Amino acid sequence: MSTLAIEIRMSVAESVSVTNDTLSVNLNDGRTILVPTAWYPRLLHATPIERKKWRLIGRGHGIHWEDIDEDISIEGLLAGKQSGESQTSFKKWLEVRQTRITKRTTGHAKK
């Protein structure tokens, strides 16, 4: 019996853009992945400036947004996976975010 070894290379990201509606990722193999930002609630709630502040991680196997603490893998995008964050975790993040925004704009936390 003989076996055939096939090497599968995972595509990696080369560039990213995010609009109010769409996350777009250009891959090194020429494909572009387009998914709704609604799949990733933190991206959906991010400001345009925060959305632009991404960096590739793992040699292009993932994307990280420091300001909103979001990581998305290329493998997950290719598999059509949405955010796995629980509602509880997201609500907590949103509350902390709102507190920080309030502090920045008013100089103190909202009570």
Region annotations inferred by a language model:
Residues 1-111:
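Motif-centric detector for short Cys/His coordination patterns
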